[in-house]
Amino acid sequence: MLALICGQGALPTRIVKNCYMRPLIVSLTQFQPDELVPDINFRLETLGTLLDLLNQREVTTVCFAGGIRRPDINSTLIDEFTQPLAASISEAMAKGDDGALRVMIEIFEQAGFDVIGADDIVPDLLPSVGVLTKRLPTLQDQTDATRGHAIIAGVSNLDVGQACAIANGQVLAMEAYGGTDWMLNSLTERVGSWPLGGVLFKAPKIAQDRRFDLPCIGPETCQKVKEAGLSGIVIAHAGVLVLDVADVIAEADRLDLFIWVCEVPL
């Protein structure tokens, strides 16, 4: 049986719709998924109890999907089943996002569960290489994409973010704790401070475990890119999830944006 460990956003719903049998829906109490009613809510302080419940439900496979911000840990709420995991949880919370997620995956694997990625369930979340839209990237857009890849690769070991905005070779913004939406919103507030144009570049971190926390885009990403004054979106092939690809392409075409799925390194 599959358990879907859900965060916020549309990805968990997309996965459930693609499953021939409904998975067990599990959610962190602080981060509820869109349009889904969890079968189990839990806190990190009760993670050990969750692992026991999953075994009781005969769960064998786990998939993590959706957005999660790092929650605060209240040591007084750690229950007896979670006490043996307390040191590992504390270690995870002290790391960057990628490091924290690696520790969490290890906890589930050591408990006997197979951990799979969202694209193992929904392969078409990863579109093929090429330009998906009517609009094509210019030579400058391609140069900016190359610059974007170099930047994301360069900061990967710092475990910072998975996206940046580049225009005419200049870094307009970098993704950090607030995520891509926050980054794009910060550009929207400053539109007019530079010539319009540029790209949103998204890619996973170098050596990232791709079963967890792959970057993603959806129709709303296109809207925010347009509002930020950028010309299009460049994503790394097999490294960025595209929710409802037909809707994303239609929205990009409507807004006269390009979407380019490229092999990296460029």
Segments from the language model and where they lie:
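General beta-strand structural signal in soluble alpha/beta enzymes
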Residues: 4-6, 25-27, 62-65, 93, ...
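Conserved mixed alpha/beta catalytic, RNA-binding, or beta-rich assembly cores of soluble enzyme
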Residues: 5, 11-12, 98, 118-223
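Hydrophobic alpha-helical segments and helix pairs
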Residues: 78-139
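Long amphipathic alpha-helical segments
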Residues: 43-48, 61-78, 108
